[in-house]
Amino acid sequence: GAINAAALVARQLIADADEIEETRRFPATITDALIASGMLRMLLPKVYGGGEVDPGTYLQAVIALAKGDGSVAWNVFVANSAALIAPFLPETSAHAIFDDPAALIAWGPPNGQGTKVVEGGYLVNGSWDFASGCRQATWMGAHGPVIEADGNPRLNPQGKPLIRTWLFPVDQAERHDVWNPIGLRGTASDSYTVRDVFVAEDFSSTREYLEDRQISGPLYAFTMQGLYAVGVAGVALGLAQAMLVDFRALAAEKTPRGRPRLA
Protein backbone atom coordinates (compact mmCIF):
# COMPACT_ATOMS: atom_id res chain seq x y z
CA GLY A 1 0.00 0.00 0.00
CA ALA A 2 0.89 3.68 -0.04
CA ILE A 3 2.29 3.70 3.50
CA ASN A 4 4.73 0.84 2.83
CA ALA A 5 5.72 2.40 -0.49
CA ALA A 6 6.41 5.71 1.25
CA ALA A 7 8.55 3.99 3.88
CA LEU A 8 10.65 2.36 1.15
CA VAL A 9 11.18 5.69 -0.61
CA ALA A 10 12.07 7.29 2.74
CA ARG A 11 15.02 4.92 3.10
CA GLN A 12 16.45 6.35 -0.10
CA LEU A 13 15.74 9.88 1.09
CA ILE A 14 17.79 9.51 4.26
CA ALA A 15 20.84 8.72 2.14
CA ASP A 16 20.18 11.57 -0.30
CA ALA A 17 18.95 14.29 2.08
CA ASP A 18 22.25 16.17 2.26
CA GLU A 19 22.60 16.15 -1.54
CA ILE A 20 19.05 17.45 -1.95
CA GLU A 21 19.72 20.33 0.42
CA GLU A 22 23.12 21.20 -1.10
CA THR A 23 22.15 21.01 -4.78
CA ARG A 24 18.56 22.29 -4.37
CA ARG A 25 17.57 19.46 -6.68
CA PHE A 26 16.11 15.97 -6.40
CA PRO A 27 18.39 13.23 -7.74
CA ALA A 28 16.86 11.51 -10.76
CA THR A 29 16.66 8.29 -8.76
CA ILE A 30 14.39 9.99 -6.21
CA THR A 31 12.11 11.48 -8.86
CA ASP A 32 11.88 8.07 -10.54
CA ALA A 33 11.07 6.40 -7.21
CA LEU A 34 8.29 8.90 -6.48
CA ILE A 35 6.74 8.25 -9.88
CA ALA A 36 7.07 4.46 -9.73
CA SER A 37 5.65 4.25 -6.20
CA GLY A 38 2.62 6.40 -6.99
CA MET A 39 3.50 8.95 -4.33
CA LEU A 40 2.69 11.87 -6.64
CA ARG A 41 -0.86 10.68 -7.37
CA MET A 42 -2.20 9.32 -4.10
CA LEU A 43 -5.15 11.74 -4.23
CA LEU A 44 -5.71 11.46 -7.99
CA PRO A 45 -8.92 9.64 -9.03
CA LYS A 46 -8.46 5.98 -9.91
CA VAL A 47 -10.02 6.55 -13.33
CA TYR A 48 -6.99 8.70 -14.18
CA GLY A 49 -4.44 6.23 -12.82
CA GLY A 50 -4.36 7.56 -9.27
CA GLY A 51 -4.49 5.87 -5.90
CA GLU A 52 -7.53 7.72 -4.55
CA VAL A 53 -6.36 6.78 -1.04
CA ASP A 54 -8.24 7.75 2.10
CA PRO A 55 -7.03 10.79 4.10
CA GLY A 56 -5.65 8.65 6.95
CA THR A 57 -3.48 6.61 4.60
CA TYR A 58 -2.36 9.79 2.85
CA LEU A 59 -1.38 11.35 6.17
CA GLN A 60 0.72 8.35 7.22
CA ALA A 61 2.45 8.20 3.82
CA VAL A 62 3.44 11.87 3.99
CA ILE A 63 4.67 11.39 7.57
CA ALA A 64 6.85 8.49 6.43
CA LEU A 65 8.36 10.57 3.62
CA ALA A 66 9.01 13.54 5.90
CA LYS A 67 11.04 11.32 8.20
CA GLY A 68 13.39 10.86 5.26
CA ASP A 69 13.47 14.38 3.82
CA GLY A 70 11.30 17.43 4.39
CA SER A 71 11.66 18.88 0.90
CA VAL A 72 10.52 15.70 -0.81
CA ALA A 73 7.60 15.25 1.58
CA TRP A 74 6.54 18.84 1.00
CA ASN A 75 6.58 18.45 -2.76
CA VAL A 76 4.66 15.18 -2.59
CA PHE A 77 1.95 16.87 -0.54
CA VAL A 78 1.84 19.84 -2.95
CA ALA A 79 1.67 17.56 -6.01
CA ASN A 80 -1.22 15.64 -4.48
CA SER A 81 -3.00 18.86 -3.57
CA ALA A 82 -2.69 19.99 -7.18
CA ALA A 83 -4.02 16.64 -8.40
CA LEU A 84 -7.25 17.44 -6.56
CA ILE A 85 -8.20 19.65 -9.50
CA ALA A 86 -8.70 16.53 -11.64
CA PRO A 87 -12.26 15.78 -10.42
CA PHE A 88 -13.28 19.29 -11.50
CA LEU A 89 -11.88 19.04 -15.05
CA PRO A 90 -13.58 17.64 -18.15
CA GLU A 91 -12.54 14.02 -18.66
CA THR A 92 -10.57 14.75 -21.84
CA SER A 93 -8.56 17.49 -20.13
CA ALA A 94 -7.76 15.34 -17.11
CA HIS A 95 -6.57 12.52 -19.36
CA ALA A 96 -4.43 14.95 -21.39
CA ILE A 97 -2.58 15.90 -18.22
CA PHE A 98 -2.50 12.73 -16.15
CA ASP A 99 -2.12 9.98 -18.75
CA ASP A 100 1.59 10.79 -18.51
CA PRO A 101 2.86 8.62 -15.61
CA ALA A 102 5.24 11.44 -14.66
CA ALA A 103 2.49 14.08 -14.63
CA LEU A 104 2.92 16.74 -11.98
CA ILE A 105 1.26 20.15 -11.71
CA ALA A 106 3.08 22.99 -9.96
CA TRP A 107 1.66 26.40 -9.17
CA GLY A 108 1.84 29.29 -6.75
CA PRO A 109 -0.95 30.67 -4.57
CA PRO A 110 -3.24 33.43 -5.85
CA ASN A 111 -1.82 36.91 -5.38
CA GLY A 112 -4.58 39.10 -6.77
CA GLN A 113 -3.50 39.05 -10.42
CA GLY A 114 -6.46 38.47 -12.70
CA THR A 115 -6.83 36.83 -16.09
CA LYS A 116 -8.84 38.22 -18.99
CA VAL A 117 -11.69 36.39 -20.66
CA VAL A 118 -11.18 35.92 -24.41
CA GLU A 119 -13.04 33.89 -27.01
CA GLY A 120 -12.86 30.21 -26.10
CA GLY A 121 -10.97 30.68 -22.87
CA TYR A 122 -8.58 33.02 -21.09
CA LEU A 123 -5.39 34.98 -21.76
CA VAL A 124 -3.02 34.54 -18.84
CA ASN A 125 -0.42 37.13 -17.89
CA GLY A 126 1.39 37.64 -14.63
CA SER A 127 3.95 36.39 -12.15
CA TRP A 128 3.43 34.02 -9.25
CA ASP A 129 5.66 32.71 -6.45
CA PHE A 130 6.22 29.56 -4.38
CA ALA A 131 5.69 27.00 -7.16
CA SER A 132 6.95 23.99 -5.20
CA GLY A 133 8.02 21.14 -7.48
CA CYS A 134 8.26 23.23 -10.63
CA ARG A 135 11.57 21.57 -11.60
CA GLN A 136 9.80 18.22 -11.85
CA ALA A 137 6.54 19.62 -13.24
CA THR A 138 5.01 18.68 -16.58
CA TRP A 139 2.20 21.25 -16.24
CA MET A 140 1.87 24.48 -14.35
CA GLY A 141 -1.04 26.56 -13.21
CA ALA A 142 -2.05 29.98 -12.02
CA HIS A 143 -4.88 31.14 -9.80
CA GLY A 144 -6.65 34.46 -9.74
CA PRO A 145 -9.82 36.43 -10.35
CA VAL A 146 -11.51 36.31 -13.75
CA ILE A 147 -11.57 39.69 -15.49
CA GLU A 148 -14.50 40.11 -17.86
CA ALA A 149 -14.30 41.94 -21.19
CA ASP A 150 -15.63 45.10 -19.53
CA GLY A 151 -12.73 45.08 -17.06
CA ASN A 152 -14.77 44.03 -14.03
CA PRO A 153 -14.12 40.86 -12.03
CA ARG A 154 -16.51 37.95 -12.36
CA LEU A 155 -18.33 37.45 -9.06
CA ASN A 156 -19.17 34.25 -7.22
CA PRO A 157 -22.63 33.63 -5.66
CA GLN A 158 -21.41 35.39 -2.51
CA GLY A 159 -20.72 38.56 -4.47
CA LYS A 160 -16.93 38.30 -4.22
CA PRO A 161 -14.40 37.89 -7.08
CA LEU A 162 -14.44 34.33 -8.38
CA ILE A 163 -11.03 32.65 -8.10
CA ARG A 164 -10.25 30.34 -10.99
CA THR A 165 -7.32 28.09 -11.94
CA TRP A 166 -5.69 27.97 -15.38
CA LEU A 167 -3.47 25.07 -16.49
CA PHE A 168 -0.79 25.05 -19.19
CA PRO A 169 2.27 22.96 -20.18
CA VAL A 170 5.37 23.78 -18.17
CA ASP A 171 7.29 25.13 -21.17
CA GLN A 172 4.81 28.01 -21.46
CA ALA A 173 6.02 29.48 -18.17
CA GLU A 174 9.32 31.22 -17.51
CA ARG A 175 10.69 29.88 -14.24
CA HIS A 176 12.98 31.95 -12.03
CA ASP A 177 15.55 30.09 -9.93
CA VAL A 178 15.21 32.11 -6.71
CA TRP A 179 14.38 29.61 -3.94
CA ASN A 180 17.14 29.08 -1.35
CA PRO A 181 15.86 28.80 2.25
CA ILE A 182 17.66 26.66 4.81
CA GLY A 183 16.07 23.26 5.30
CA LEU A 184 13.71 23.24 2.31
CA ARG A 185 16.03 24.12 -0.56
CA GLY A 186 15.01 21.02 -2.47
CA THR A 187 11.38 22.07 -2.88
CA ALA A 188 12.28 24.43 -5.75
CA SER A 189 9.45 26.73 -4.70
CA ASP A 190 10.52 29.15 -7.40
CA SER A 191 8.74 32.11 -8.98
CA TYR A 192 7.46 32.08 -12.56
CA THR A 193 6.11 34.43 -15.19
CA VAL A 194 3.46 33.81 -17.84
CA ARG A 195 3.08 36.08 -20.88
CA ASP A 196 0.05 35.98 -23.19
CA VAL A 197 -0.63 32.28 -22.71
CA PHE A 198 -4.02 31.19 -24.03
CA VAL A 199 -5.78 28.63 -21.84
CA ALA A 200 -8.88 26.97 -23.27
CA GLU A 201 -12.00 26.83 -21.11
CA ASP A 202 -11.58 23.06 -20.71
CA PHE A 203 -8.22 23.54 -18.98
CA SER A 204 -9.60 25.94 -16.42
CA SER A 205 -11.65 25.31 -13.33
CA THR A 206 -12.71 26.58 -9.96
CA ARG A 207 -12.39 24.27 -6.95
CA GLU A 208 -14.64 26.33 -4.70
CA TYR A 209 -17.83 24.33 -5.21
CA LEU A 210 -18.18 20.59 -4.69
CA GLU A 211 -21.20 20.52 -6.98
CA ASP A 212 -18.87 21.36 -9.89
CA ARG A 213 -17.05 18.01 -9.57
CA GLN A 214 -17.13 15.69 -12.57
CA ILE A 215 -16.13 12.78 -10.31
CA SER A 216 -17.67 12.04 -6.94
CA GLY A 217 -16.77 9.58 -4.20
CA PRO A 218 -15.93 9.70 -0.49
CA LEU A 219 -12.47 11.24 -0.95
CA TYR A 220 -13.77 14.10 -3.08
CA ALA A 221 -16.49 14.95 -0.59
CA PHE A 222 -13.70 16.60 1.39
CA THR A 223 -12.94 20.21 0.58
CA MET A 224 -9.64 20.96 -1.10
CA GLN A 225 -8.52 22.99 1.91
CA GLY A 226 -9.34 20.11 4.24
CA LEU A 227 -7.13 17.68 2.34
CA TYR A 228 -4.47 20.37 1.97
CA ALA A 229 -4.35 20.60 5.77
CA VAL A 230 -3.83 16.83 6.02
CA GLY A 231 -0.71 17.13 3.85
CA VAL A 232 0.73 20.07 5.77
CA ALA A 233 0.19 18.21 9.04
CA GLY A 234 1.90 15.12 7.64
CA VAL A 235 5.04 17.05 6.74
CA ALA A 236 5.21 18.71 10.16
CA LEU A 237 4.56 15.48 12.07
CA GLY A 238 7.14 13.50 10.11
CA LEU A 239 9.81 16.14 10.60
CA ALA A 240 9.03 16.37 14.32
CA GLN A 241 9.19 12.60 14.78
CA ALA A 242 12.52 12.39 12.96
CA MET A 243 13.86 15.27 15.07
CA LEU A 244 12.95 13.46 18.29
CA VAL A 245 14.69 10.29 17.13
CA ASP A 246 17.85 12.26 16.31
CA PHE A 247 17.66 14.14 19.60
CA ARG A 248 17.47 10.93 21.61
CA ALA A 249 20.46 9.53 19.73
CA LEU A 250 22.43 12.71 20.39
CA ALA A 251 21.45 12.78 24.05
CA ALA A 252 22.56 9.17 24.50
CA GLU A 253 26.01 9.86 23.03
CA LYS A 254 26.76 13.38 24.21
CA THR A 255 28.81 13.77 27.38
CA PRO A 256 28.49 17.14 29.15
CA ARG A 257 31.83 18.37 30.46
CA GLY A 258 32.61 16.84 33.79
CA ARG A 259 29.56 14.60 33.84
CA PRO A 260 28.72 11.02 32.89
CA ARG A 261 26.67 10.21 29.81
CA LEU A 262 22.99 11.17 29.97
CA ALA A 263 21.72 7.77 28.86
Can you annotate each of these PLM segments?
Residues 127-173:
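DPxDG-like acidic metal-binding loop motif
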Residues 1-44, 50-60, 234-263:
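Alpha-helical interface subdomain recognition
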Residues 61, 124-126, 194, 240:
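Buried hydrophobic positions in well-ordered alpha/beta secondary-structure cores of metabolic enzymes
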Residues 182-263:
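Glycine-rich beta->alpha junctions and the first turn(s) of the following alpha-helix
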Residues 112-116:
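A structural signal for short hydrophobic beta-strand segments in well-ordered beta-sheet cores
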Residues 102-105, 181-185:
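Short Gly/Pro-enriched turn/cap motifs at secondary-structure boundaries
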Residues 119-125, 139, 189:
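A generic structural signal for beta-strand entry/edge sites
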Residues 37-101:
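Internal helix-loop-helix
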